[in-house]
């Protein structure tokens, strides 16, 4: 087992990474403040791991709250289901809410914990690669709004993140690839040697090699923890973690939540960010193509939806948390391994990026 730490003063917390951690109560019980525990999961994950976790928490008053699975349910109505469960069971301010699932469950359970009786204890047990390397670390919680993704939420840190890498053995291939999009992101924005490592090990990662997965998770979480410790509320450097997300969120919103997985939209969105960085002369076309090839090898889409127009993108991108005073800030690559957030770019470069023929670009790479 490896343990990292998110340094936030009195609110610092550990990230435990290893195989079989779900069965080790000593990693959880020090972070549970009362006798009441609510485990929030979904209809896919609960049959696999809910009973095991309940056994690990023997002696506690455990309340299971099982939600429907999918991004389409990351909304106010489903959030109310969590509150209904907590109130009906008379959970008090010393309850602990545990998120057992992927990013959707973590975001909603965390938001519920932030709101319930103005804040109760919260623990993250992420079961997908995407949630293990990204959404479980850093305290971002929330739900989607019909007009924009993650537009309603709060910063609310967990007291511990428990990453059992064995849970990836039950993860569908498509979900695994979606998680790799966020892993690749770290190499692009802050760790080019990691990008090289990923190029050498992407096949092992897709083959569920435990050693390779552990390295990828550790390096991703270490990068995320460092950034969050420096900028918890995304007033500066933390925004660079959103490489590809402005374009990607537009894709998710336009297509309908859940049609494209978040990681799939991030991959296509990052290709657009690479294209724009190349058009600005910040990275070469060869470096752009290097990123595209890695996403392809990870089994991810690299072409935005063909029916999305420039106006579609601009409409959705106008409703983005990085918009300040009406100006859209974008995360782009100054060079491979170094990201910046900026609103200083020629409008025509953004327009050219939105109308670029990505299908032809990918076909050219195949040739």
Curated annotation (Swiss-Prot):
Pathway: Metabolic intermediate biosynthesis; chorismate biosynthesis; chorismate from D-erythrose 4-phosphate and phosphoenolpyruvate: step 2/7
Co-factor binding details: Binds 1 divalent metal cation per subunit. Can use either Co(2+) or Zn(2+).
UniProt keywords, alphabetically: Amino-acid biosynthesis, Aromatic amino acid biosynthesis, Cobalt, Cytoplasm, Lyase, Metal-binding, NAD, Nucleotide-binding, Zinc
Places the protein is found: Cytoplasm
Residues that bind NAD(+): 69-74, 103-107, 127-128, 140, 149
Protein EC: 4.2.3.4
Source taxon at top rank: Bacteria
Annotated function: Catalyzes the conversion of 3-deoxy-D-arabino-heptulosonate 7-phosphate (DAHP) to dehydroquinate (DHQ).
HAMAP family, alphabetized: DHQ_synthase
Protein name: 3-dehydroquinate synthase
Organism whose genome encodes this protein: Pseudomonas syringae pv. syringae (strain B728a)
């Amino acid at each position: 087992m490896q343990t990292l730490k998110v340094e936030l003063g009195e609110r610092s917390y550990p990230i435990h990474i290893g195989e079989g951690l779900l069965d080790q109560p000593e990693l959880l019980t020090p972070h549970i403040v009362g006798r009441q525990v609510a485990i929030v999961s979904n209809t896919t994950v609960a049959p696999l791991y809910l009973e095991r976790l309940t056994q690990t928490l023997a002696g506690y008053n455990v309340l299971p709250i099982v939600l429907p699975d999918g991004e389409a349910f990351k909304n106010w109505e489903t959030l109310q289901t969590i509150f209904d469960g907590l109130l009906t069971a008379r959970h008090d301010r010393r309850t602990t809410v545990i998120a057992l699932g992927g990013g959707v469950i973590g975001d909603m359970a965390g938001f519920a914990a932030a709101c319930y009786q103005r804040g109760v204890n919260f623990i993250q047990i992420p079961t997908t690669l995407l949630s293990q390397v990204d959404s479980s670390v850093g305290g971002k919680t929330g739900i989607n709004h019909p007009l924009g993704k993650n537009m309603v939420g709060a910063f609310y840190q967990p007291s511990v993140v428990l990453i059992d890498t064995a849970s990836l053995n039950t993860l569908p291939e498509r979900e695994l690839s979606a998680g790799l999009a966020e892993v690749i992101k770290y190499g692009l924005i802050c760790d080019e040697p990691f990008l090289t490592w990923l190029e050498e090990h992407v096949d092992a990662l897709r083959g569920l090699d435990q050693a390779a997965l552990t390295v990828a998770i550790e390096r991703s979480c270490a990068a995320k923890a460092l950034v969050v410790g420096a900028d918890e509320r995304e007033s500066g450097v933390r925004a660079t973690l959103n490489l590809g997300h402005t374009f990607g969120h537009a894709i998710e919103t336009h297509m309908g939540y859940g049609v494209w997985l978040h990681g799939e939209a991030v991959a296509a969105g990052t290709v657009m960010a690479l294209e724009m960085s190349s058009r600005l002369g910040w990275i070469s076309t060869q470096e752009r193509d290097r990123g595209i090839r890695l996403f392809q090898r990870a089994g991810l889409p690299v072409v935005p939806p063909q029916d999305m127009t420039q106006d579609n993108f601009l409409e959705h991108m106008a409703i983005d948390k990085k918009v300040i005073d009406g100006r859209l800030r974008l995360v782009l690559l100054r060079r491979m391994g170094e990201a910046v957030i900026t609103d200083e770019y020629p409008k025509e470069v953004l327009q050219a990026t939105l109308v670029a023929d990505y299908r032809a670009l990918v076909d050219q790479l195949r040739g």
